[in-house]
Amino acid sequence: MGKVIGIDLGTTNSCVAIMDGAQPKVIENSEGARTTPSIVAFTDEERLVGQPAKRQAVTNPSNTIFGVKRLIGRRVDDAEVTKDKKMVPFTIVNGGNGDAWVEAKGEKYSPSQISAVILGKMKETAESYLGEEVTQAVITVPAYFNDAQRQATKDAGKIAGLEVLRIINEPTAAALAYGLDKKNSQTIAVYDLGGGTFDVTILEIDDGLFEVKSTNGDTFLGGEDFDMRIVNYLADEFKKEHGVDLSGDKMALQRLKEAAEKAKIELSSTTQTEINQPFISMGANGQPLHLVMKLTRAKLESLVGDLIKKSMDPCKAALKDAGISPSDVDEVVLVGGMTRMPKVFEEVTKFFGKEPHKGVNPDEVVAMGAAIQAGVLQGDVKDVVLLDVTPLSLGIETLGGVFTRLIDRNTTIPTKKSQVFSTAEDNQNAVTIRVFQGEREMAADNKILGQFNLEDIPPAPRGMPQIEVTFDIDANGIVSVSAKDKGTGKEHKITIQASGGLSDEDIEKMVKDAEENAEADKARKELVEARNQAESLIHSTEKSVEEHGDKVDPTTVEAIELAIAALKDDLDKDGVSAEKIKSGLQNVTEAAMKLGEAIYKAQSEGGDDEPAAADARPSDDDIVDAEFEDLGEDKRK
């Protein structure tokens, strides 16, 4: 069995970790960073992910997709999605099944597909470090994610070529990383304010037993909202000063978003920062306009104060559900980059009556917890038992549109619960079971997860048939429901798939697309590497010819120049393949070897006239062009 990796699939940044012996280890990506921006961009030539995608966002805002986690498992007409449409420079569209999808370069993509690209980068990062293929993962989600969002995250893993062994809640993962070595019994609160979502979870830890007592949150509250407050403020101030509205200019908005994020981060460690965006727009007379503005920490806190206060309501609800008061909490663990903001730290301290624990890295602790859970599933981590809960109540719609709960929120999972219902009319031969998730009393006010029919019920007076409805929630928090007519024994069972959601066929197609893209990405990488090799070889060989060409016969020099010219010609052609460039590389290398041999021979015959050059020649016959370059360097010295 290969290594199981732990992935924190974040709204703003993602992170991957593995178990290295008894401790989790975060793996650096190809850019040398421990976290990767959760951004995917589409250009005319290629698809970019992570830091390269972020770098080009200002010049390609419509095709740079970020914060897609806020859309995953959501309907296009959700209030939160409608709000998000106004905040992002890319287009959010109807996926055809009512789900919120995104559009880039004229193509529609599901949030699961975009997430799969990010997961693919995490997979690649782990494979590069481990030197072996990775096929299994534990992926984290916000504790307050509903069934549709969890299922869509699992789909993303499948599209990325990963078998998702477990979906684990982010605060629970953070608690695992925090409490792995803790032997004493304690109650902890995990306050997780990330880029797009907020969760609070109350847990009891006791010598390897991690028991979640309650969880609450808001899947549309995070750093993105803080950034947009700054963006709106900057745009309003600019309009007051110059009379120009930047809200319709996608490129200007993307620049403001990057500036806002940078200013927000700086104001965590300083009390004032300057935002400077030259040439952000044009005046009525064609004059360039610049945005130069000072932003103080106090002003930022006034802009986002209500957002911070908003996070306190779920904290109150979580404590109430756990049946404890703030003073019963032994330790508060902060997770997510937003918790670095001094005002957030201050409000959390005030609410719980104690300073939060500072011993964990808020950006990495979730991935580390996922790696620990991966180690538990793999059998590498012993004596750790995790008991999580379902974040939202589950039930069905009954007569009058009432939401009848079968499983209450904060029930430990996995769990199973049955209840007997009956018909509402005489001789009713079928019932429709409509499954909902939420806390409102009327079914229509909650999130519908799906529906199915139980048919061929024998004619009987209303209230007589006995229909047993059973809910089953697995350890991933994913729901399956069955309905059984106790009179006939007829049963209908489904794993809930959201009324939109991705079908198996959709997922298979996306898996295939992802594999094709991976091949295309690999081919593109090979081409870039071959081009770089070719340009480097041309440069070093031309330098060698320039410095030593007079020491060899003209036919050798001519052969080298012809090989270089042919390779340059290949490099200038559109659509040239990596194989063609490699072939040209080989020709130049072979021709250059003759130059090296001739130079070495001339030096040997010349005795010790040029000791530095002779010494640079290795004693064996494995001459590579890098040594020609060294030879040239030595000659110059």
Curated annotation (Swiss-Prot):
Composition-biased stretches (Acidic residues): 621-637
Presence of the UniProt keyword ATP-binding in the record: yes
Pfam families linked: HSP70 (PF00012)
An MF annotation (GO) of this entry: ATP-dependent protein folding chaperone
Region of interest (Disordered), ranges: 600-637
Keyword hit for Chloroplast: no
Entry-linked Gene3D superfamilies: 1.20.1270.10, 3.30.420.40, Actin, Chain A, domain 4, Substrate Binding Domain Of DNAk, Chain A, domain 1
Regulation: induction: By stress conditions e.g. heat shock.
UniProt keyword annotations, A-Z: ATP-binding, Chaperone, Nucleotide-binding, Phosphoprotein, Stress response
PTM sites of type Phosphothreonine: T197
Domain of life: Bacteria
Function: Acts as a chaperone.
Family stated for the protein in its record: Belongs to the heat shock protein 70 family.
HAMAP family per the UniProt record, alphabetical: DnaK
Protein name: Chaperone protein DnaK
Species annotation: Ruegeria pomeroyi (strain ATCC 700808 / DSM 15171 / DSS-3)
